[in-house]
Amino acid sequence: MTGIVYKSTGSWYTVKSLQGHFMECRIKGKFRMKGIKSTNPIAVGDVVDYDLDENSDVVTGTITKIHDRKNYIVRKSVNLSHQMHIIASNLDYVFLLITINNPPTTTNFIDRFLVTAQAYGIETILVFNKIDTYNEAMLDEQLFMQYIYQEIGYKCLRVSSTEGKGIEELKNIMKNKVTMFSGHSGVGKSTLVNAMEPTLHLKTKTISEQSKQGQHTTTFAEMYDLSFGAQIIDTPGIKGFGIVDMEKEEISGYFPEFFKLKDQCKFNNCLHKDEPKCAVKDALEKDKISYSRYNSYLKILEGDDETYRTDIYNDDRIASDETRNK
């Protein structure tokens, strides 16, 4: 039998058959995908074959094959730094939910996510959530951040789950697609799913007043069928986003504004760091490239996985950019 993995708890997988029936399945022994060193061999979104095991009181299944994936998105494993964790597979879009505060989402985190999604062939749409909660200064910051990413070709949406702003536009994009919500804990992923599909009643939790960080409410990634013809994968909140399996020379290729300037650099293997006659650094000096994006690039290049909590909006360079672009 063939089906799609709707939920993974690490040892058991909920699979929906092509006939619409759900079955709890597991794997036997080691199950590895060719060329992929991951902590989880099977991910939500995978198309799998499975056999029924009817020898027990409760009928379960055993997964025997994973079909080739159209794509998948990964991050560095929390416990095993040299291995990856597959978040989900076979996606049409990923929606990265961003909040300016409660909790804050930094450009470093956004850029690391975008680099990984681009590397694995997944289109990302940035969703600025909770816009109804921002004061004037926060709205200015949100609009400036949106400007940075729209300028380099990323689609951006502004939504409010509580007031319903932007919900219909989001639903129109999701219709007949398999998509995923991702972002920090507390950015409102489950709340947004509930706003689109109130009958789901996904569990939500408020932000910790002490840490201003979200608290996990989604424990495992899980796919849901929505009434307007969409399939959404809700994922646990991500604190950091470690990048794996990427050579230094290829990183700039996943920054669209860097990639289009690469042929103008003096050296073919230019890392846009210390080299002379670098078109990217020249564009940076002329304010044609965002300083926050360049800073993120350097952090990724240096293998610094600890910068996702900080941002550089208070940097004088950023402040002057904001004033100039308004």
From Swiss-Prot:
Classification via Pfam families: RsgA_GTPase, RsgA_N
Domain CP-type G, chain residue ranges per copy: 80-241
A GO term from the CC aspect: cytoplasm
Residues given in the record as Zn(2+) binding sites: 265, 270, 272, 278
A GO molecular-function descriptor: GTP binding
EC number(s) per entry: 3.6.1.-
Biological processes, Gene Ontology terms: ribosomal small subunit biogenesis
Record-linked NCBIfam families: ribosome small subunit-dependent GTPase A (TIGR00157)
Family, per entry: Belongs to the TRAFAC class YlqF/YawG GTPase family. RsgA subfamily.
Protein name in the entry: Small ribosomal subunit biogenesis GTPase RsgA
Organism: Flavobacterium psychrophilum (strain ATCC 49511 / DSM 21280 / CIP 103535 / JIP02/86)
